[in-house]
Amino acid sequence: MNNSRVEGSSGRAARKLRFALMGPAFIAAIGYIDPGNFATNIQAGASFGYKLLWVVVWANLMAMLIQVLSAKLGIATGKNLAEQIRDHYPRPVVWFYWVQAEIIAMATDLAEFIGAAIGFKLILGVSLLQGAVLTGIATFLILMLQRRGQKPLELVIGGLLLFVAAAYIVELVFSQPNLVQLSKGMAIPSLPTSEAVFLAAGVLGATIMPHVIYLHSSLTQNAHDGTRQERYSATKWDVGIAMTIAGFVNLAMMATAAAAFHFNGHTGVADLDQAYLTLEPLLSHAAATIFGLSLVAAGLSSTVVGTLAGQVVMQGFVRFHIPLWVRRSVTMMPSFIVILMGLDPTRILVMSQVLLSFGIALALVPLLIFTGNKSLMGDLVNTTLVKRIGWMIVVLVVALNLWLLIGTLLGL
């Protein structure tokens, strides 16, 4: 009886520790449902119905593994990915990594910031510039939570992630997808045309985000509760839950677009404004409003995460620190320039996703090298199977993103 009591109390302690260590993956998961994902998933669903849902499933499984490895690096070494690159690579390589990571962080932020501004424009009827001002104010307010520590920020961003998930549950109810076809689309790989291959590459490129690979390793590096194995076990739960929610949102985006647009003859829906305006007469004003609100929530939370990632990149690579409000002020300038110049915001959003393709392999390769290093990782070193899967992901991601890049440059 005493043994069962001890086992029960140790089980409760393990659950308590697991709960206490949850949060970092929810911040990272926001990067997987940013406005770039909205645009890509809507276009894929409108063009090909449920046929590309399997890409979302596999991309999400890859992303889960990548985020576990990133978090594990921070747990095992007490240093984030940028710091490990700084410690192990020659200075010119480190500076190259810093510059490309900053460019990619800004490109990511451009898409996220403009996405939130479009959301405000759609639901409030304001101009895109006014939407951008509202986005700037809102992100400053959210970033102020960082002064109170990481946990309040985790709670707010986790809440926004859950809001977007709830919004898409409602959208699925409104759109009433065919569950049999939906299940087939998730389970059976299909690439019916060259455009489908291009969109599949876009879905993968919009799913695996280099900036959250850097960020996640920094969010776990200073956790000291429990043993390393206990922290790693808790992290796997954290990633599993957060990334499952993010994966559901991506599936729901594509399934809603398929049910609402593709099967109603609107196969050419390709941008966020058009999706909003098409949803209203097809489903209802409420469905369109919920879409707009979810876009705002995803844009705001992901642009905050992008700002945090940029801070980690700068501090990790070059040991230079600037206040978050200064970084936020500087990184939102390109968005205002794009808007003031009257450029097509959705086109800019898609182009920024293409730019991200350069950074994915650059983040993944050192991550796999470091997490496969026994002297660095100790008992948390990657197994042979994980190493093989990791390098297969690198090859696949590089190949598909090269396809995406070439197709974009050639106007395919």
From Swiss-Prot:
Source organism of this protein record: Enterobacter sp. (strain 638)
Keyword tRNA-binding: no
Membrane topology term: Multi-pass membrane protein
Gene Ontology cellular-component terms listed: plasma membrane
Gene: mntH
Family: Belongs to the NRAMP family.
Sorted UniProt keywords: Cell inner membrane, Cell membrane, Ion transport, Membrane, Symport, Transmembrane, Transmembrane helix, Transport
Protein name listed in UniProt: Divalent metal cation transporter MntH
HAMAP family named in the record: NRAMP (MF_00221)
GO annotation, biological process: iron ion transmembrane transport
Transmembrane stretches, start-end: 19-39, 46-66, 94-114, 122-142, 155-175, 196-216, 241-261, 290-310, 329-349, 350-370, 389-409
Function: H(+)-stimulated, divalent metal cation uptake system.
Compartments, record wording: Cell inner membrane
Pfam families: Nramp
GO MF term list: cadmium ion transmembrane transporter activity; manganese ion transmembrane transporter activity; metal ion binding; symporter activity
Superkingdom of source: Bacteria
